[in-house]
A protein has these predicted regions:
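Alpha-helical transmembrane bundle of multi-pass membrane proteins
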Residues: 2-281, 303-544
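ABC-type ATPase nucleotide-binding domains, specifically the catalytic core motifs of the NBD
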Residues: 284-286
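Short, well-structured alpha-helical segments
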Residues: 288-303
């Protein structure tokens, strides 16, 4: 069978069924086989087709009305990302906080109290080291006990680990506390995009997964506001209060997630069909969807991916799943190669560009607020224009701006060049959250097979940390006065790596906008070239 042909737009958008399919659907309209564990695919296939067509034909607003609670629970799960965001930005801001530098730093005759380059980098990578371990724990844990309980477990451990950070009296203890805090971060970041992409219909997958980037921005806003307020404060209070604020989040989130429904896709994978139906009913309005048909749609996809053995990490690197794994890993890793490190180190970047500490903190807060606004704008762009389109155009603009940053940093130390470097740093940090960053979360949530999703998102985030950890050392060295002292000239470095990522994405990143998980599975199996996904047609009856 040919894998691609010219698209009939009308037929594709309406997903019109053949007379045979219509007759089959009416013959099984009582949904009798949908929740029958012994039923074969042929018994419930017509209902599965009906549910998939219903999702395809939903508009965005209609999808929100049909699945209001799915939107809410995706919001709650995404909120867990605030924990990592808050702490990452907190440690990055602490290296510029006078009270923190005075307590934990060394005295430099030129710059006053400073945190040495080695300890700056160590503090910035410590949480990521823990998270790298955490993402490998997340996959097997989630496959066994589900997204909810794995995340709740992480939240409870996080409460204890914050205690160590709060009472730390030395940089080595802070380093250890951050590694421990990173363990639950790994669970949150691996589970959130997978859970969010599984509980919403097709039209809501983009905004549901992009909420992760929004909460990342919110975490940085909170940190920016708190550290700006406490920047002039003397003594331990200046950093103890920002640390203690972390306790606001874990317990309320754990309670809410205890009340949340489990992913129906995970329940279907476990053969718990009645529970899956209950979960679907809690996620959507029963008056607007047929619950048994929705479960049948999930069963059809799970059956296509069926394997008698438990999912394992080695499977991620076999056959077509290797390509899917590489896309997820690439989308994650590229964030650190296309401007993310400038965004994460915004305050320190502004300070090294020549701005006063108070101005740097204020500009960092403004940057975070603009990122939050631009993330919400990205929901519209990615939903209607597509993931590949936004990712490629956003990355191209990002590369141009990074090169411009390098040029601005090369023309001298005048006020004009300092202002240009600061302005471009702000623009790069903000536009990164309009294009490549939020599009990445959608790609990560959609690409993997349902069966291997917890493992794939975990290994993908691991690639993020594996790339980020050495680059944090490099980035700190490039900016630090006792290191490379490049300032804006670091734009040349990240512009070069960003260009490489753009070229790779152009040839290998497919467009998955508007595709059901069945269609995505089939298109990967047929090895359709990435640039032809947008025009490929998959028949509603196809299972392979």
């Amino acid at each position: 069978m040919s894998s691609t042909h010219v698209v009939d737009t009308k037929t594709e958008s309406q997903h019109v069924d053949s007379p045979e399919v219509e007759a089959q659907r009416h013959a099984s309209h009582d949904n009798g086989y949908d929740l029958d564990e012994k039923a074969k695919v042929a018994d419930y296939k017509a209902d599965a087709v009906e549910a998939e067509n219903a999702e395809h034909n939903m508009g965005v607003l209609e999808a929100v009305k049909a699945y209001p609670m799915a939107t809410f629970w995706a919001f709650i799960m995404s909120f867990t990302i605030i924990m990592e965001s808050y702490d990452v930005f907190l440690c990055n801001n602490f290296v510029a906080l006078p009270a923190f530098k005075e307590k934990y730093g060394v005295y430099d005759p030129v710059h006053g109290y400073v945190i040495t380059t080695a300890w700056q980098s160590a503090l910035q990578v410590s949480g990521q080291l823990g998270a790298l371990i955490g993402v490998f724990l997340a996959g097997p844990l989630t496959s066994r006990i589900g997204y909810r309980w794995a995340t709740i477990t992480g939240l409870m451990f996080l409460n204890a680990f914050i205690l160590i950070f709060y009472f730390a009296e030395s940089l080595p203890v802070i380093f250890v506390s951050q590694i421990l805090e990173g363990l639950p971060w790994g669970i949150f970041i691996a589970n959130a995009p997978a859970y969010c992409s599984e509980i919403v219909p097709i039209k809501l997958r983009a905004p549901a997964t992009q909420m992760l980037q929004m909460f990342w921005a919110i975490g940085s806003i909170i940190v920016g506001a708190v550290t700006y307020v406490y920047n002039p404060v003397k003594g331990d209070t200046a950093f103890k209060i920002p640390i203690a604020i972390q306790w606001i989040f874990p317990t309320p989130l754990a309670i809410l997630l205890f009340l949340a429904p489990e992913s129906p896709w995970w329940l279907v994978r476990k053969g718990r069909l009645e529970e899956a139906a209950t979960s679907v009913g809690r996620l959507g309005r029963k008056s607007r969807l047929n619950v048994p048909e929705t479960v049948a749609m999930m069963r059809r996809v799970i059956e296509m991916e069926k394997d008698e053995s438990e999912p394992g990490y080695f499977e991620l690197f076999k056959g077509v799943d290797l390509y899917r794994t590489l896309i997820v890993c690439g989308a994650y890793a590229a964030q650190n190669l296309t401007g993310n490190l400038i965004a994460n180190q915004a305050v320190y970047f502004f300070e090294q560009a020549g701005l006063a500490t108070n101005t740097a903190f204020a500009l960092g807060l403004i940057t975070s607020a603009l990122q939050w606004i631009f993330v919400m704008l990205s929901w519209i762009l990615t939903t209607y224009l597509g993931r590949r389109t936004i990712y490629l155009y956003g990355s191209a603009i990002n590369v141009v701006l990074l090169i411009a940053l390098g040029i601005a940093g090369s023309v001298g130390n005048s006020n004009a060049s300092t202002n240009a470097v600061a302005a471009l740093g702000l623009i790069i940090s903000v536009l990164f959250t309009l294009g490549p960053a939020p599009a990445s979360w959608v790609i990560i949530g959609e690409t993997s097979s349902i069966r291997l999703r917890p493992l794939t998102t975990g290994i993908g985030r691991a690639s993020y940390y594996i790339v980020e950890i050495p680059l944090i050392f490099l980035s700190s060295y490039l900016l630090n006065p006792t290191g490379g002292n490049l300032g804006g000239k670091c734009g040349y470095v990240w512009g070069g790596t960003g260009l490489f990522c753009l070229v790779v994405a152009f040839f290998w990143l497919p467009e998955m906008k508007g595709r059901s998980y069945r269609e995505i599975d089939i298109m990967f199996k047929r090895k359709i070239p990435a640039r032809k996904w947008k025009t490929a047609v998959i028949d509603v009856q196809d299972d392979e």
